[in-house]
Amino acid sequence: MDSGKIYSGTNVENASYPVGICAERNAISHAVACGERKIIAIAIVGGANYSHNDFCAPCGMCRQFIREFGNPKEITVIFAKSVTEFKEMSLEELLPESFGPASLKQ
C-alpha cells in the first residue's frame, strides 16, 4: 500500500462458487476497510493444490479489482513460489488497455 503497510488475505472457497473470494480481493478489501486507497504492489503466493511448481497469477476479476486502486504502470505484481523464487510484472503488463476510474470521467 502507499502507506507502507502490508495486508494479507486468503482464498475463501464456498459450496456456491460465485460466493467465494480470491485472496487478492480479500487483502485489498481489508486494506480499504483500514482506510487505504492506493496499491503500489501486491504479492501472490500459491499454486494449484498447494503446489509450488507454478507461479500463481491473479484471475481476471482480481486484475480489474487491483486496477481500481492505482495506476497500472506503477503497480508491481509479485508472483512467488518461495522467498527466493519469484518474478515481477507491472499490472499494465497483466491487464493491458485497462478500464479504470478515469475511464468513467471521459
Language-model features and meaning:
Residues 1:
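Short, acidic, Ser/Thr-enriched surface-loop or helix-capping motifs
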Residues 36-106:
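C-terminal binding/interaction regions
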